[in-house]
Amino acid sequence: KNWRVMYLDIDVHHGDGVQWLFYDDPEVLTVSLHESGRYLYPGTGGVHEMGEAAGRGFSMNVPLEPYTQDGSFLEVFDRVVPYALEQFRPDALLVQCGADAHFSDPLADLLLTTRAYETVFRRLLALADEHTEGRLVLTFGGGYALDATVRIWAMLTLLALERDLPEALP
């Protein structure tokens, strides 16, 4: 069976490499929520980048303005990700869980808190159960504020393993 895969990139940088790899492939939907390329490397990820040939319409980019905070990010996530899953109907969801949109990251200007990451991860687990029968691959990536990155990745691991989160992650 040819699997349809949705690739979601929530790293602060545009998911350009994966997007270009599947730019003409209608079996892979790439969705990237990232800080706008007008301000941040690699300078790509505009809404006009939608795929080509048979893959036209299978690349979705949501460039966010610098200083985007939890509420706005979660609103965008809630409007885009469930809709993309409902419309595309993938067999599996692969998520690049960058930790560099955290407010303490020195290389970018999105202002997410650890609580926003927790909310996103919980929603991803529920969405995967609902739309892909739980077929979910989570990868780590991005994160240059080491304390925040370790906390975010530890939290993601605990949630994926269905473990309780401690009151404070060290």
Regions found by a protein language model. Give the residues of each.
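A general "terminal functional-core" signal
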Residues: 1-170
